[in-house]
Amino acid sequence: PMDNQIFTQSYNAIHHATELGKPEWRAVALIIQAYQGHEIVDFYGAAPFSDWRNLKRTPPLTYEKGEDIYNLIFDDLDEAIRILKERQPSREEFAKIEDLTIKTLSNGDWRMWVKFANCIKMRMAMNMVKINPGTAQSKFEQAVTDEIGVLTDTDAKDIAYYQEQNACALWRIGNEWHDIRLGASFENILKRYNHPLLTRWFDTN
Protein backbone atom coordinates (compact mmCIF):
# COMPACT_ATOMS: atom_id res chain seq x y z
CA PRO A 1 0.00 0.00 0.00
CA MET A 2 0.97 3.62 -0.47
CA ASP A 3 1.68 4.18 3.22
CA ASN A 4 4.54 1.68 3.07
CA GLN A 5 6.42 3.67 0.46
CA ILE A 6 7.13 7.37 0.57
CA PHE A 7 6.12 7.84 4.20
CA THR A 8 8.56 5.23 5.44
CA GLN A 9 11.35 6.60 3.28
CA SER A 10 10.82 10.23 4.27
CA TYR A 11 10.11 9.76 7.98
CA ASN A 12 13.66 10.09 9.30
CA ALA A 13 14.48 13.11 7.17
CA ILE A 14 11.31 14.90 8.24
CA HIS A 15 11.56 14.12 11.94
CA HIS A 16 15.30 14.10 12.61
CA ALA A 17 16.99 16.35 10.04
CA THR A 18 16.42 19.57 11.98
CA GLU A 19 17.96 18.23 15.19
CA LEU A 20 20.95 17.13 13.12
CA GLY A 21 21.34 20.67 11.81
CA LYS A 22 20.07 19.80 8.32
CA PRO A 23 16.61 21.38 8.03
CA GLU A 24 17.03 21.54 4.25
CA TRP A 25 16.83 17.75 4.20
CA ARG A 26 13.50 18.03 6.00
CA ALA A 27 12.36 20.57 3.41
CA VAL A 28 13.13 18.26 0.48
CA ALA A 29 11.46 15.32 2.22
CA LEU A 30 8.34 17.41 2.88
CA ILE A 31 8.13 18.33 -0.79
CA ILE A 32 8.52 14.71 -1.92
CA GLN A 33 5.93 13.60 0.62
CA ALA A 34 3.57 16.36 -0.54
CA TYR A 35 3.91 15.17 -4.13
CA GLN A 36 2.87 11.65 -3.11
CA GLY A 37 0.37 12.73 -0.47
CA HIS A 38 -1.82 14.93 -2.65
CA GLU A 39 -2.14 12.09 -5.16
CA ILE A 40 -3.49 9.84 -2.41
CA VAL A 41 -6.29 12.34 -1.88
CA ASP A 42 -6.89 12.68 -5.62
CA PHE A 43 -7.10 8.90 -6.06
CA TYR A 44 -8.88 7.79 -2.89
CA GLY A 45 -10.35 10.80 -1.08
CA ALA A 46 -10.30 10.42 2.70
CA ALA A 47 -7.22 8.66 4.08
CA PRO A 48 -5.38 8.12 7.40
CA PHE A 49 -2.75 10.62 6.28
CA SER A 50 -1.46 11.68 9.70
CA ASP A 51 -1.28 8.08 10.89
CA TRP A 52 0.57 6.98 7.77
CA ARG A 53 3.08 9.79 7.93
CA ASN A 54 3.79 8.84 11.54
CA LEU A 55 4.23 5.19 10.48
CA LYS A 56 1.09 3.99 12.29
CA ARG A 57 -0.42 1.14 10.31
CA THR A 58 -2.32 -1.00 12.77
CA PRO A 59 -6.02 -0.28 13.34
CA PRO A 60 -7.72 1.77 14.48
CA LEU A 61 -6.62 4.39 11.95
CA THR A 62 -8.08 7.88 11.85
CA TYR A 63 -9.31 8.81 8.38
CA GLU A 64 -9.13 12.51 7.53
CA LYS A 65 -11.14 14.40 4.93
CA GLY A 66 -9.40 15.23 1.69
CA GLU A 67 -9.77 18.94 2.38
CA ASP A 68 -8.01 18.59 5.74
CA ILE A 69 -5.17 16.61 4.17
CA TYR A 70 -4.79 19.24 1.47
CA ASN A 71 -4.49 21.91 4.17
CA LEU A 72 -1.76 19.90 5.91
CA ILE A 73 0.12 19.53 2.63
CA PHE A 74 -0.16 23.24 1.86
CA ASP A 75 1.34 23.95 5.29
CA ASP A 76 4.16 21.47 4.63
CA LEU A 77 4.96 23.11 1.30
CA ASP A 78 4.98 26.58 2.86
CA GLU A 79 7.38 25.35 5.53
CA ALA A 80 9.64 23.66 3.00
CA ILE A 81 9.81 26.77 0.82
CA ARG A 82 10.58 28.94 3.84
CA ILE A 83 13.39 26.63 4.99
CA LEU A 84 15.03 26.49 1.57
CA LYS A 85 14.89 30.25 1.15
CA GLU A 86 16.42 30.76 4.58
CA ARG A 87 19.12 28.09 4.27
CA GLN A 88 19.89 28.36 0.55
CA PRO A 89 21.88 25.10 0.71
CA SER A 90 24.91 24.70 -1.52
CA ARG A 91 25.35 22.21 -4.33
CA GLU A 92 27.79 20.33 -2.10
CA GLU A 93 25.09 19.99 0.54
CA PHE A 94 22.64 18.57 -1.98
CA ALA A 95 25.29 16.09 -3.11
CA LYS A 96 24.79 14.37 0.26
CA ILE A 97 21.19 13.48 -0.60
CA GLU A 98 21.17 13.54 -4.41
CA ASP A 99 23.38 11.76 -6.92
CA LEU A 100 24.57 14.81 -8.82
CA THR A 101 26.52 12.69 -11.30
CA ILE A 102 23.13 11.92 -12.84
CA LYS A 103 20.85 14.70 -14.06
CA THR A 104 18.06 15.29 -11.56
CA LEU A 105 15.40 17.91 -11.05
CA SER A 106 17.52 20.26 -8.96
CA ASN A 107 21.03 19.47 -10.19
CA GLY A 108 22.13 20.86 -6.82
CA ASP A 109 20.14 24.10 -7.05
CA TRP A 110 17.77 24.67 -4.11
CA ARG A 111 15.67 27.03 -6.21
CA MET A 112 14.51 24.12 -8.35
CA TRP A 113 12.99 22.45 -5.28
CA VAL A 114 11.16 25.68 -4.48
CA LYS A 115 9.84 25.80 -8.04
CA PHE A 116 8.74 22.18 -7.78
CA ALA A 117 6.95 22.91 -4.50
CA ASN A 118 5.16 25.85 -6.10
CA CYS A 119 4.10 23.62 -9.01
CA ILE A 120 2.58 21.15 -6.57
CA LYS A 121 0.65 24.02 -4.98
CA MET A 122 -0.61 25.06 -8.41
CA ARG A 123 -1.71 21.53 -9.24
CA MET A 124 -3.52 21.18 -5.92
CA ALA A 125 -5.20 24.53 -6.46
CA MET A 126 -6.51 23.41 -9.85
CA ASN A 127 -7.77 20.18 -8.31
CA MET A 128 -9.88 22.05 -5.75
CA VAL A 129 -11.04 24.98 -7.88
CA LYS A 130 -14.64 23.72 -8.19
CA ILE A 131 -14.86 22.84 -4.49
CA ASN A 132 -13.25 25.89 -2.93
CA PRO A 133 -12.57 28.47 -5.65
CA GLY A 134 -11.48 31.21 -3.25
CA THR A 135 -8.76 29.16 -1.60
CA ALA A 136 -7.77 27.68 -4.94
CA GLN A 137 -7.23 31.11 -6.45
CA SER A 138 -5.28 32.29 -3.42
CA LYS A 139 -2.95 29.28 -3.44
CA PHE A 140 -2.44 29.43 -7.20
CA GLU A 141 -1.59 33.13 -7.15
CA GLN A 142 0.71 32.57 -4.19
CA ALA A 143 2.66 30.02 -6.21
CA VAL A 144 2.96 31.94 -9.47
CA THR A 145 3.88 35.24 -7.78
CA ASP A 146 6.57 33.69 -5.60
CA GLU A 147 9.95 35.37 -6.12
CA ILE A 148 11.54 32.05 -7.12
CA GLY A 149 8.63 31.11 -9.35
CA VAL A 150 7.58 27.81 -10.90
CA LEU A 151 9.03 25.34 -13.36
CA THR A 152 8.94 26.58 -16.95
CA ASP A 153 9.79 25.19 -20.38
CA THR A 154 13.46 25.97 -19.77
CA ASP A 155 13.64 23.86 -16.60
CA ALA A 156 14.15 20.13 -16.22
CA LYS A 157 10.90 18.49 -15.15
CA ASP A 158 11.84 14.87 -14.50
CA ILE A 159 12.02 14.41 -10.73
CA ALA A 160 13.21 10.82 -11.09
CA TYR A 161 16.25 9.36 -12.73
CA TYR A 162 17.04 5.87 -13.87
CA GLN A 163 20.47 4.37 -14.37
CA GLU A 164 19.06 2.12 -17.08
CA GLN A 165 16.53 3.08 -19.70
CA ASN A 166 14.23 0.19 -18.82
CA ALA A 167 14.54 0.61 -15.04
CA CYS A 168 11.20 2.44 -15.07
CA ALA A 169 8.50 -0.22 -15.17
CA LEU A 170 6.04 1.95 -17.10
CA TRP A 171 8.65 2.73 -19.76
CA ARG A 172 9.41 -0.96 -20.17
CA ILE A 173 5.74 -1.96 -20.36
CA GLY A 174 5.00 0.73 -22.93
CA ASN A 175 8.11 0.54 -25.09
CA GLU A 176 9.45 -3.02 -24.82
CA TRP A 177 6.26 -4.96 -24.26
CA HIS A 178 4.18 -2.58 -26.43
CA ASP A 179 1.37 -2.93 -23.92
CA ILE A 180 0.23 0.70 -23.52
CA ARG A 181 -1.48 2.22 -26.51
CA LEU A 182 -3.85 5.05 -27.38
CA GLY A 183 -7.46 3.88 -27.39
CA ALA A 184 -9.60 4.48 -30.47
CA SER A 185 -12.26 6.46 -28.59
CA PHE A 186 -9.73 8.87 -27.07
CA GLU A 187 -7.96 9.19 -30.42
CA ASN A 188 -11.27 10.07 -32.06
CA ILE A 189 -11.94 12.80 -29.48
CA LEU A 190 -8.50 14.34 -29.97
CA LYS A 191 -8.85 14.25 -33.75
CA ARG A 192 -12.39 15.64 -33.68
CA TYR A 193 -11.20 18.70 -31.76
CA ASN A 194 -7.92 18.89 -33.67
CA HIS A 195 -6.18 18.78 -30.31
CA PRO A 196 -2.42 19.50 -30.49
CA LEU A 197 -1.64 17.03 -27.71
CA LEU A 198 -2.40 14.13 -30.04
CA THR A 199 1.03 14.46 -31.62
CA ARG A 200 2.71 15.58 -28.40
CA TRP A 201 1.55 12.72 -26.20
CA PHE A 202 1.57 9.87 -28.71
CA ASP A 203 3.91 8.47 -31.36
CA THR A 204 2.74 6.78 -34.54
CA ASN A 205 3.42 3.08 -35.12
Spans of features found by a protein language model:
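Structured, solvent-exposed acidic/aromatic patches
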Residues: P1-I32, Q36-N205
